[in-house]
Amino acid sequence: MKKYLALIMALALFSCEGNKDILLPKADKTIVSDVQEHSPIYIFFKVEGKDTIADVNRKNSIVSTNWIFNIDKRLPLRLVVPELIKLQAKKEGSMHKNEAAENFFSYANDVKKTMAFLPFTKVKYVIGKPLINSIYFGKNDLLKFNSQLLKKDELQGYINNLMIEHESEIFVSFDKNLSYDEYIKNKIIMNSIKITKKGILISNLEYVF
């Protein structure tokens, strides 16, 4: 199985059919630089009349491999997440699944001029709003912890200074109208946060509403 080479810079990926293109998100940090034994999932940005559609192509996907999700950055989360839920369920429910196989989002590191990947195998998506302890990423760089407005560079310090009396789980939530590009950038921020406060856990559940 061929692998993605980190030397290749791809701001757009091309499918095998119809010369469709996908505009990838861009970021300045690489989480994972290379994924082997993979197969691709494509989610294209498609317009039909006045409607935007998430057009999924998983014809070349093999359940036993790592899946790389190549998703157009222009798509809103409200269209992307339902497709992710269906694809995760299909892979998880397959009799041929490989417990060691993971799922990754692809994006472009525009500083190093390389491809990069963000693992999300353990993420479980929920369409709805968490009741407590919620980090919320909204439009126009809005960031809140519960009702407290924050700057993104304040988030790690705020979490680690929370006053807690027992083990607490923090849930991450996103505005359903965020672009996939914004989502990936915010996911990278969350990935970089180091929790030093004993008893605080970041949940694998991600809410979209």
Language model: regions and residue ranges:
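Positively charged n-region of N-terminal signal peptides that target proteins for export
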Residues: 1-4
